[in-house]
Amino acid sequence: MRPVRMKKLKAVILDEKIDNVVRSLHEEGIVELCDLSEKLEDLEWKTLLSPSSSADYVRNVTSLMIKAGRILDMFSSVSQKETSIKDILNPKPVEKKKVSFNSYQEVIDYAEKVLNEISKEVDGPAERLSELDNKKSKLLQLKEQISYLKGLEFDLKYLGSGEYVFIGAGSVPKEKLGELKAELDKVADGYIGIFSGSEFEKDKKIRVPIVFVTLKEKLENVLSEIRKFEFERYDISDVEGTPSEALSKIESELKAIESERNSLIEKLKALAQKWEKELLAVYELLSIEKARGDAYSQFGKTDRTYYIEAWVPARDAEKAKSLIENSADGFAFVEITEPDEPEEKIPVLLDNPKVIKPFEMLTEMYALPKYNEVDPTLLLVPGFLLFYGIMLTDAVYGLLLTIIGLFIWKKIGKVSEGANKLGYILTLAGISTVIMGIITGGYLGDFTYEFFGFDVTKTPLALVNPLGESYYINNNNPLFTLGSISVTNGPMAILVFSIFVGLIHLLIGLFVGFKENVKRGNMGDAFINQGVWILLILSIFVGIGLMFAGANTMIAGGIIGIFVVLAILASMYKGYKSGGVMEAILGAMDVTGFLGNVLSYARLLALCLATGGLAMAVNIMAKLVGESIPVIGIIVAIIILLVGHTFNFVMNGLGAFIHSLRLHYVEFFSQFYEGGGKKFSPFKANREYTTA
């Protein structure tokens, strides 16, 4: 129930052998390299070692990665693959390329060879496609500008500067046109003509295209003034004919460009199909080599050696030592020691049984344990599954969840580790829900009663009815009677069970916290933070047990009262130590906090009722519609059932997941768990497209 024990690995390696060592460690993936740059700032270490930097070959590798990435981006842009529902629901594992390289130079040579071959085939079409795209973009912009001038029939070749006059085109906001004409006439001393076309909308503004003609000697004044009126100038050059003729010519050019583009794209698609897998493998190999080269920057070095430090799980320590020594052909000194750093700096690796391991993701969602802290995953699993089943509590919903979980686990989980874990968790949660659904007689709520007149909860097939009386629990046959309290229906029984389970759940957390404090030598904290609450819960069980045995209520209440007072005094003492009298007074309120934690487990009943109640409402509504509307009512009723139960399943399934986690994260973990550990991050070659 604790993270894997770690060892500190320290090694001095001959510089000629460092590449072999790094490659071996990277492939094996059992150590986490330590960055020594901060340590080497220390004066004592500075005299022994100097900081290392990334390997020289990293620059070359990075350049090749950029080139490969650019081609992959181009392949991706031209061959946008359509993903079918079948591909999403049943993804195929990636076919990996087998590779065998013994040095970075071999990888670089291979990458250069492949990239050169691809470039010979791809560069020409890709460059031409880029040219066409640029030309198309310019033509589309030109087309837009000329289209605004369509009502002004003049030869566009005259736009620009002539021997004596300048002709310009553009657009201005409609409301400024009148003022513009007046002001330009002033600054041009009347030597200007302005012609306007049909208005159009652009950027939510009504604009008007204009063409103006002025003497060249007046142009500077005109341009200076026209800018004040939000004038948007049209850059139309090397175009002949009227706007209509020019637009027709542009359309022809665009069609020709599109035809050539399509031909080039088809050619590049074929090249993508031919080279993409190979290129993805190349990119991955280069990424791996870059990671290896960058790792050098974490080392220390002398003239002829490298010094490395790493974290390694204790179970793999000897394996890592042998790996380094063998890779260095014996030219290495390796030392394995116990950690001497604060626990916050020691990486955490969780190690649970296979059936529990997927649930580690739920622990990580909260926080990883510190190195010397308890791993709560094993404690979380039974509570999470039990609470989930109680909250969703419908056998049909549970069966559906199990099927969905199995599908995610076995299908999508083949290509996604996260989906694999989630699918496994949902499968077990679904099984738990089926069991709880059978216990409570929940089969799409009261579907069997509403449509077939068969009330499962009134038969021996169901132990308890969340919405009322059942065969086993009713007015004539109460679950139990304690003083004036008589449990004669399902909701009351489930509430009592929820509080009981909550007390047990908290008790387990308190025992773990007590044990941890004792182990650390914090006896005072163990008693104040956990011990008094353990005694209080036990006193509640003893008091209730005595009442069941027929003891006087005053005696049972007195026993519980004694430990309530003890808990208040302990909380006040704790508050006084931390902040004086005021904190002591506030500390007395911890008892109400404890009560709040216990009552929080009543949410088990709340979600149980929500699931069953909403399912019942859907069934009643569907039945009423089906019976009151001839023929079509049956179809509508089926739609109501499908939509209503789907909504209920999704919403309460999600709610059960969230609230089950909340009971652990807030109520349970707060009794013993702090978290805040640093995840073990192995120096490992991540291979998706290749296998060594």
Swiss-Prot record:
GO function term, MF aspect, one: proton-transporting ATPase activity, rotational mechanism
Temperature dependence: Optimum temperature is 80 degrees Celsius.
pH dependence: Optimum pH is 6.0 for ATP hydrolysis.
Domain of life: Archaea
GO BP: any one term: vacuolar acidification
A GO cellular component annotation in the UniProt record: plasma membrane
Location(s), subcellular: Cell membrane
The keyword Metal-binding belongs to this UniProt entry's keyword annotation: no
Keywords: Cell membrane, Hydrogen ion transport, Ion transport, Membrane, Transmembrane, Transmembrane helix, Transport
Pfam families found in the cross-reference section: V_ATPase_I (PF01496)
Record has Membrane as a keyword: yes
Membrane topology: Multi-pass membrane protein
Family affiliation: Belongs to the V-ATPase 116 kDa subunit family.
Descriptive protein name: A-type ATP synthase subunit I
Name of the coding gene: atpI
